[in-house]
């Protein structure tokens, strides 16, 4: 892998919550390249949310480190599973508010807001209070707020939960477009078909340990063993083996 294209490198991350007997993460590695989408997979309680919190700097690992290879740290934006907007404000007012938190000129803030609105197809909802928008529009608003930062790395945590198929397809297409224009994506989800559609690599965790990591096509091929029919069969193979071990 060319170090010049690496956006973020996490090496041997270990994190243990106070009062817990076992670490939530145990020696997790990840190298994210520019314009690469990595699916972050694992059962509930596998360590996905903890891993994301370390990448965001919300928690500090007890060992291991996170580094970047460029001249300056990458801009990281987060789309949480929970709604990250003010429900009593309109979509436009939410975008105005979050853009105002960035160190931008008025002209640049207006430009980014306009780009986010058009990118996430919020034009007809811009003056509607967020609480009265559908689940799909609310998810699009979540993404639009993150895109105001023009991120180098976008962390998405279950971004399509509770939306209809049309809204899900739109969100997936938008993420795919971002990757194709050079944005790196870490995509945490339980929906295997979404990962298969937009991610070239995966990181599969369980009980804080890496069960599988790397190029998705290579992992599905079985690396000399019987190939897996799809990502779900690969997931079940590794997580069930973890239970047996």
Task: Name each region found by the language model.
Residues 41-43:
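The feature captures the beta-strand-to-loop junction immediately N-terminal to the Walker
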Residues 56:
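Helix-to-loop junction immediately C-terminal to a conserved catalytic motif
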Residues 96, 100, 107-125:
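Conserved ABC ATPase "signature" region
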């Amino acid at each position: 892998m060319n170090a010049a294209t690496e956006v973020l490198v996490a090496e041997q991350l270990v994190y243990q919550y106070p009062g817990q007997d076992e670490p939530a993460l145990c020696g997790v590695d990840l190298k994210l390249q520019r314009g690469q989408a990595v699916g972050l997979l694992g059962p509930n309680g596998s360590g996905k949310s903890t891993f994301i919190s370390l990448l965001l700097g919300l928690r500090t690992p007890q060992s291991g480190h996170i580094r970047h290879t460029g001249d300056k740290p990458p801009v990281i934006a987060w789309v949480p599973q929970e709604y990250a907007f003010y429900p009593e404000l309109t979509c436009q007012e939410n975008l105005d508010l979050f853009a105002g938190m960035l160190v931008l000129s008025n002209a640049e803030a207006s430009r980014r807001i306009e780009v986010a609105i058009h990118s996430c197809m919020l034009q007809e909802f811009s003056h509607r209070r967020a609480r009265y928008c559908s689940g799909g529009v609310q998810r699009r608003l979540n993404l639009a707020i993150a895109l105001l930062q023009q991120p180098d790395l976008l962390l998405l945590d279950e971004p399509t939960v509770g939306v209809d198929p049309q809204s899900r397809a739109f969100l997936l297409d938008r993420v795919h477009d971002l990757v194709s224009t050079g944005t790196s994506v870490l995509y945490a989800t339980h929906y295997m078909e979404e990962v298969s559609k937009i991610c070239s690599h995966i990181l599969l965790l369980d009980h804080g340990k890496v069960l599988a990591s790397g190029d998705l096509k290579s992992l599905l091929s079985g690396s000399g063993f019987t190939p897996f029919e799809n990502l779900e069969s690969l997931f079940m193979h590794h997580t069930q083996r973890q239970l047996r071990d």
